[in-house]
Amino acid sequence: MPEKNRVRYGCSSEEIARDFAEQLKYNQDADVYHTTKEGRYEAIAYAIRDRIIHQWDLSRKTQRKNHSKRVYYLSLEFLMGRAMTNNIINLGIEKPVKEALSSLGYTYEELRDTEPDAGLGNGGLGRLAACFMDSLATLELPAYGYGIRYNYGIFRQQIKNGYQVEQPDNWLKDGNPWELKRPDLTYPVFFGGKVTYLRENNRDTYKWVPDEQVNGVAYDTPIVGYGGKTVNTLRLWSANSPDGFSFQEFNSGDYTEAVRKKINAETLSQVLYPNDTLYMGKELRLKQQYFFVSCSLQDIVRRFKRYENYSWKNFPNEAAIQLNDTHPSLAVPELMRILVDNEGLGWDDAWDITVKTMGYTNHTLMPEALEKWPLPMMEKILPRHMQIIYEINRRFLSSAVSYFPMQNDKIAKISIIEESNPKMVRMANLAIIGSHSTNGVAALHSKLLVENMFPEFNLIFPDRFNNKTNGITQRRWLLDANPDLASLITEAIGDKWITSFDEVEKLKAFAEDPSFVEKIGNVKTKAKLKAADFLKKDCGIILDTDTLIDVQVKRIHEYKRQLLNALNIVMVYNRMKNDKAYRESFQPTTYLFGGKAAPGYVNAKLIIKFISSLSAVINSDPQVNKLLHVYFMPDYRVTLAENIIPATNLSEQISTAGTEASGTGNMKFMANGALTIGTLDGANVEMAERVGLDNIFIFGHTEEEIANLSKNYSSIEWINGNPEIKEAIDLIKSGFFNNNEEGIFNPLLSSLIEQNDRYFLMADLALYNKRHDEASTLYKENRAEWNKKSLLNIASSAFFSSDRTIKEYADDIWHIKPCHVKKSKEDTVLEDARKSN
């Protein structure tokens, strides 16, 4: 029998089982025989959370006592996925949790699979933020993540008749046992109104008189570092109305007006990325961004002012604020507003503090993806901030003129205000000017930022631009997602790799050991069987595990070139139909696609439809369907990725060179032993450097070659110059894949022909097809060599840990140090309660 007072923090299987049973009984009035699956999941989640809470509190107290500088990571997205397995692995209690549940007649897997994904992100941006939070806690670096607690995350994707259908992702419908509501941390956020001017005490004073208020309430989620010592906080803001429900209006019969303010306020945290094709959607997105920035900065300032005798000049020594893309860049004028209007600092002092505090991460090389807001909208919603932006811009441009005398075009380019109709506010320019650091996320990306996108800013601020190549957390993407491979690695080199990923380089020593290389292949086979089981349950796909598994999973976008992959499959299909010898020698292959298209992105949604149509034709063609399979996996999310990535043989990373900032999916596949077929784009360049060109299938035109090609590019010449490409295009034109929907794929054909193929698919397709043939032949004819290359990819992925990335941010940008937190061995709940009174 466990000691009664150890039930909430003891880590034996008995103590966990008792806590689980007590959660059922006292929180749900249930027992182990009469409860639902959801109730059991909630009970075990609360039991695990109990083992986090004390260390979470101790982490905060230790960081406060040590006066540790903290990093505040502001991101509109946090694609966390499921929390339970990650938490028990990082706490080191996986075995006792499973034993506890087994002793009561339940399986851990059943309850694990009940947890919904926390889909508070759209793709790489949000998943990067999640990996960074894991690394920050594991490295014992004091940190808060700040974002929005969306009631509905990224939509749930269904495929109906080949089309993407968006369904609401009501991930909070059963509550979230990992979070704690913090009503004591509620902040007012204001919009609209006017600004009044006053001259007093020999200084200009501005007062914002807003006409709208919402409140932001904090919800905290613990982020457990590996080893369970440091527990940092992800703080998400939920919007509500300060006015609530109006009984007066309700009783007078105006039922709609009685709840209007409440509904309008709560809209701010309802949906991730509302459709902004309409004015109302744009306004809502702008309000969302300011809402989370305002709440976060009020919270940061509150924490800073808690110290006695605080001095604002020390603020950058206490706080580093990192802007994950431009979505939080309103933090620049908001901090200025707080310092100048609320705290009474002079402009120069406030600006010095702001720039020293802020860092900005750029995530795009697409000029049209750089965020801009209509100036009239900004003036209407945030009138005081617009005044501050004007003043920032005026001072900056007056100093920049000396760099570009008589060059009005360059001055116009670096201005925060774009002189269009209507005028626009350029958020990337604001972030660069207002931050002491601007970083790219891969070596090529950072090079192109300073050479192509922002050369003028680099001339003015040469010390501000730097590179921080992205990374992934090996704890989720290898230890958690691929336990068989993790065990094999630990068996070979020990377990230090879990927190020091450089250790996996030691695996290179096993590349000439045939028995170990064979084990790598066996692990991949087991992962395929697991993936097949998952896909059958998740979406009904029957995966042939004896085939080469070729996977492209990522956001659907024309620059990521899912269409290139699909066109290559059409070429392979035609060749199989026309050439018996080719068909008989073909390596059986399954092509898996997954990813979501933005609801308003017509061509991306058509690409999904085309892949689905391709799948329907090929999978039902008896001449080829025992050799060639094509599937679109619906509702791509973290959990699906965790099951598919370990099973992949060939990873598709095929964006047009010079368009992908970095990518992190490429790193996840590499660490799990997939070979990559890819262009020299984003982090693929650094992957190729580390693994060697013999162990990666690089193809296509380089970024420089694309730039030269674009000067007189003609896609139709490339089509007509290759009979197989022309045959594939003609087959699509003929309506062969249309399924009685006449002209359905004309917009895609138009993008390739009439619109001259912006992303150079036709220029790269033959090269891509050739490399595919080489990969297929190697897999078929020399599996041992393939497995050796797989091992070398795992060993060469050492550089791509988010631990390495975060250490670079901490040393070069944030200047923060680890704060070591002792592991609590005893329950001090009563002592803590007495001290608090």
Predicted regions and their residues:
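A conserved ligand/cofactor-binding region detector
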Residues: 1-837
